[in-house]
Amino acid sequence: MENITAQLKRGISRQFSTGSIRRTLSRQFTRQSSLDPRRTNMRFSFGRQSSLDPIRRSPDSSKSDDEPHMSVPENLDSTMQLLFMASKGDVRGIEELLDEGIDVNSIDLDGRTALHIAACEGHLGVVKALLSRRANIDARDRWGSTAAADAKYYGNLDVYNLLKARGAKVPKTRKTPMTVSNPREVPEYELNPLEVQVRKSDGISKGAYQVAKWNGTRVSVKILDKDSYSDPERINAFRHELTLLEKVRHPNVIQFVGAVTQNIPMMIVVEYNPKGDLSVYLQKKGRLSPSKALRFALDIARGMNYLHECKPDPIIHCDLKPKNILLDRGGQLKISGFGMIRLSKISQDKAKVANHKAHIDLSNYYIAPEVYKDEIFDLRVDAHSFGVILYEITEGVPVFHPRPPEEVARMMCLEGKRPVFKTKSRSYPPDIKELIEKCWHPEAGIRPTFSEIIIRLDKIVANCSKQGWWKDTFKFPWK
């Protein structure tokens, strides 16, 4: 008896890889099961598993006809008792439970109903009894499998034919370009696509993230459009972005939630930041106070320094701009959009844009001259972008405003021009201007690394606090 209970509970150990997310006090994401009034907090792992379960048993697993009768363990809740009886073919026991008021469509942690279990095991009598009690014939488990699909997979043709005659649907299994050959190789980040709800009215924005819900939690989702499945370049770009997002963890970098790679549509899911991006924020606020400007600058620098220090290969953003910098609920900045531009590695610290014409927008005046001109570059291209952003934060207007972006990009990248500083020098520490000029210098070798930028920004903060400048406005919330 204890062995049966242990098998039933063993599946709970896999719970960590699925479910909704919650933020802990340490600002890290952990996984928890979605809440469903009919869902038990256990996973039914006794007997045959879903036909789409990555670690299911083999369809030709033999069931011993000499297996002794087993009674229901006393410490199981009503849902698990129902599923257990379905697995053992106990029609009378099931009817007694249903007469007591148990929901015939009760599900376990994997979304499996008694009908799923009975179909897997081939218990025709149980299936008939459940259908007579109006069991949902097309209920799908967390992998998208139905009772009919399970019956077909395990070769229970009598059950399958009955379900088909009652109008059951068998979901089509469509392979994705990232489908693994061995079910045990399914990534831990894999999400159940049925738990991700994207509003149809929003449509699908090609290549862009959109707001969705995952188990009731707001998230941002990028959905791979249908035309991309036959395009190796787009699949590789999707895979590259996913690989980078999966390995980064930093307070100033967008948080990866999970992805759907074994089902269509394929999608990447990241945290949702309700306050939008820095571009919209600057349009509303204009020039920021010195304290907020420095705090934002440090947020960006710390996130970028983390990306540049990633091992074994640093992550060059190559598209750092306000639209790719998000604000979380607390007003902290997070870097996003990295991995969108594919790079060809020239050496350990040198790279080149893989397909310049396809990936580089020549109206993007945040990019460094060497990127604009399709030259070989290193990590310092991101320092140039940081300098332009820091200028806009302190000045409150885009560079060379109101000239069109295409003209501004040519002026900065081809003509080597830089905008003048219009804000009064006493409004900001003089070291800020010097740092901006170093960052956007035409010569990449003169630009500082982000570790050096952080040191300089910390010194500016310390000097301002020490000298008591801007007492009314220069207050640091982190001190």
Swiss-Prot record:
Which ranges are annotated Basic and acidic residues under compositional bias? 54-69
The residues that hold ATP are K200, S201, D202, G203, I204, S205, K206, G207, A208, K222
Instruction: From the Swiss-Prot or TrEMBL record, state where the protein is found.
Output: Cell membrane; Endoplasmic reticulum membrane
Domain of life, per lineage = Eukaryota
Enzyme category, top tier: transferase
Residues that the record marks as modified (Phosphoserine) are S17, S26
Q: Where are the ANK repeats?
A: 77-106, 110-139
Query: What's one Pfam family here?
Result: Ank_2
- The residue ranges of the Protein kinase domain are 194-461
Name the active site residues.
D319 (proton acceptor)
Q: How does it sit in the membrane?
A: Peripheral membrane protein
Activity regulation: the record says:
Kinase activity is suppressed by interaction with CML9.
Post-translationally, this protein is described as follows, namely:
Autophosphorylated at Ser-17 and Ser-26.
The UniProt keywords, alphabetically, are: ANK repeat, ATP-binding, Cell membrane, Endoplasmic reticulum, Kinase, Membrane, Nucleotide-binding, Phosphoprotein, Plant defense, Repeat, Serine/threonine-protein kinase, Stress response, Transferase
Against InterPro entries, the record matches this protein to: Ankyrin_rpt (IPR002110), Ankyrin_rpt-contain_sf (IPR036770), Kinase-like_dom_sf (IPR011009), Prot_kinase_dom (IPR000719), Ser-Thr/Tyr_kinase_cat_dom (IPR001245), Ser/Thr_kinase_AS (IPR008271), Ser/Thr_Kinases-Pseudokinases (IPR051681)
Q: Which GO terms describe its cellular component?
A: cytoplasmic side of plasma membrane; endoplasmic reticulum; endoplasmic reticulum membrane
Q: Which SMART domains match?
A: ANK, S_TKc
EC number(s) recorded for this UniProt protein: 2.7.11.1
Tell me which Gene Ontology terms the entry assigns under biological process: innate immune response; protein autophosphorylation; response to osmotic stress
Q: Where is this region: Disordered?
A: 29-73
Induction of the gene: Induced by mannitol and the pathogen-associated molecular pattern (PAMP) flg22.
Q: Which reaction does it catalyse?
A: L-seryl-[protein] + ATP = O-phospho-L-seryl-[protein] + ADP + H(+); L-threonyl-[protein] + ATP = O-phospho-L-threonyl-[protein] + ADP + H(+)
Similarity comment: family membership: Belongs to the protein kinase superfamily. Ser/Thr protein kinase family.
Quaternary structure, per UniProt, is: Interacts with CML9 and POT5/HAK5.
Function recorded in the entry:
Functions as a link between plant defense pathways, stress responses and potassium homeostasis. Promotes osmotic stress sensitivity, responses to the bacterial-derived pathogen-associated molecular pattern (PAMP) flg22, and resistance to bacterial pathogens. Promotes the accumulation of POT5/HAK5, a potassium transporter that mediates high-affinity uptake during potassium deficiency.
Q: What is this protein called?
A: Integrin-linked protein kinase 1
**Organism listed in the record:** Arabidopsis thaliana (Mouse-ear cress)
Q: Which gene is the coding source of this polypeptide chain?
A: ILK1
